Amino acid sequence: MSTLLIELLTEELPPKALARLGEAFARGLFDGLSAQGLLEEGAAVEGFATPRRLAASITGARRTAPDRELREKVLPVTIAFDAEGKPAAPLVKKLAALAKTVGVEVIAAESLERGPDGKAEALFYRYTARGAVLADGLQTALSQTIANLPIPKVMTYQRPNGENVQFVRPAHKLIALLDSEVIPVSAFGLQSGNVTLGHRFLSAGEIVIQDAASYASTLESQGKVIAGYGKRKEAIRAELLKTAGADTVVMPEALLDEVNALVEWPVVYPCHFEEAFLAVPQECLILTMQTNQKYFALTDAQGHLRNRFLIVSNIATDTPEAIIQGNERVVRPRLADARFFFEQDKKKPLADRVPLLSRVVYHNKIGTQLERVSRLQAIAGQLAEKLGADVAHASRGALLAKADLLTDMVGEFPELQGTMGTYYARHDGEPDDVALACSEHYQPRFAGDALPSTATGTVVALADKLETLVGIWGIGLQPTGEKDPFALRRHALGILRMLIEKPLALTIDDALQIAAASFDGIAAVKPNLAAITDFLYDRLRGYLKDKGYSTNEVEAVVSQRPQRLDDIVARLEAVRAFAALPQAEALAAANKRITNILKKTDVAIGAVQPPLLKEDAERALHQSVVSAEPQVHDAFARGDFTTALKTLAGLREAVDTFFDGVMVMADDTALRDNRLALLAELHGLMNRVADISKLAA
């Protein structure tokens, strides 16, 4: 297969957009050529992206696309000809336009085919479309790809000839190479060739790409450029780990991506800062190194910050002392600022900052952060009472939860809200669980994040999420489609995870009603607890499916809308065990049948009257239900849901016999009502743990 190379050499591209630009450039060219038939079956594309270039290498490119036999609809027959059967004006006009499009002088009406078009008879023109030539097809694909790139911000620059050009950054060279042959295309006033530039400092002069397949290796050997985005990123990761030695690299993927987008020939150097800075909370130091300097912090085996850090340079040298000293010099003022913020913040207790939250607007329809804190205290206090947590500590934790929003450190680094509250609360002598609640009430911050570790933190976290969910929903800002500006989906999932995973003996209704009561007197807030409850159960379904439970298993439990979720996993495991029994399928089908029968009845169903049980089958079923009831109820009371459901397996024979030999909807109303009562009793027993009808195929 032939290899096609396209490279666009530019000034330094925006680091945070480089990965997206590289992917879009490669995919756009591939799709554009594929749509024109210029790629063979099995063709593949490899994208390249560095700070100064976007490139794509496509294997399986064709010089010419195959010809295609096309059949194009012209007009319905009813309007194509006049009364005498001659071509009418619409047909003449259409054929003239079509001839121009196809590239022929004239299309005779006699050359058209007749055939159905699904509605009526129509005229069709059959012709051979010549396959696109690579140069033309590539020009089209390149122009479309450039136009569709996800450019964060366009800049205007001027070519040497005075032409104004708009692109993400000035473009300097263009390569278009099929194997070793230059394909003539253009972009931004540049004509394609086979010449590029290597590293801005480590490579001298132009580099000729002799063959498209050798692009990456030529750039690496001659130009000191690792062109592959992924390859360069993994090289950085490996070098960081190697240089760190026994220490652990604090290496968030976002930082790794950003640094990768800043270098073409990455080299890692170790640096140091004064140990005195370690008196500042390590989260502050790590964040300032990452955010302001793009450095990688190091921690020891216990997770404590070291006074060493790693930098990724774009310069390889045998004498890196100047690079190391320069980076050590610029980080000191940043660390000194963090230390200053920390020392200044400690001078004012968190509790003294709380009244100033009246200056911070939470939402113009709901009020200030101070008003919100008052609601959090009310909610947290009631939740603590219900859950047996320390009410005073919960109220204190809620009072201080948002106070660090007014500190200098959080003003500089908003990501540290909560974290700094814990440090400052401990400095102020607050109980440890109260201090921890300042940070833990934000947990879980994202999917898979840890839950609060303390009872106080859990209660305040629940209060925070419930207040947000009920309040924001209550002013009409519930999630819609892809929009969820207040992260209500995340808050809902956090509530569910705490109820399930802690677990907490708290009903959904109680939690929502406590939160709703805190908004009494705020006219703008109209809590819609029914809609929020539906929303929570929908999120619950997704959470449980992500845990590996099947749709049927989840529906069997969630369709009953259990109020307490502390036993939901046990119910699901019981459903799974029941579904594996040989009797499960028949009982699930029978339960579904019973559900449908009971739905259709419009009479009040009372208790079973044994004297009215006339048939042997119904007497046997009643006896089976009476025998199973105490076992099921006892197992349910113990939380042994598996035993409760497995006990139902013993009913299978009696249920089958009943439906085979007993007419439920008998003409005798007394018999009918008694049989409905028997089915209702059976239905209640079968659905005590879960709605097993949901297991029916």
UniProtKB/Swiss-Prot annotation:
Keyword Transferase in record: no
InterPro entries in alphabetical order: DALR_anticod-bd, Gly-tRNA-synth_bsu, Gly-tRNA-synth_heterodimer
GO function term, MF aspect, one: arginine-tRNA ligase activity
Protein's GO biological process: arginyl-tRNA aminoacylation; glycyl-tRNA aminoacylation
EC numbers, comma separated: 6.1.1.14
Catalytic activity field: tRNA(Gly) + glycine + ATP = glycyl-tRNA(Gly) + AMP + diphosphate
Predominant localisation class: cytoplasm
Annotated Pfam families: DALR_1, tRNA_synt_2f
GO cellular component, one term: cytosol
Keywords: Aminoacyl-tRNA synthetase, ATP-binding, Cytoplasm, Ligase, Nucleotide-binding, Protein biosynthesis
Subcellular location: Cytoplasm
NCBIfam families for this protein: glyS (TIGR00211)
Family affiliation: Belongs to the class-II aminoacyl-tRNA synthetase family.
Quaternary structure and partners: Tetramer of two alpha and two beta subunits.
Name listed for the protein in its UniProt record: Glycine--tRNA ligase beta subunit
Encoding gene per record: glyS
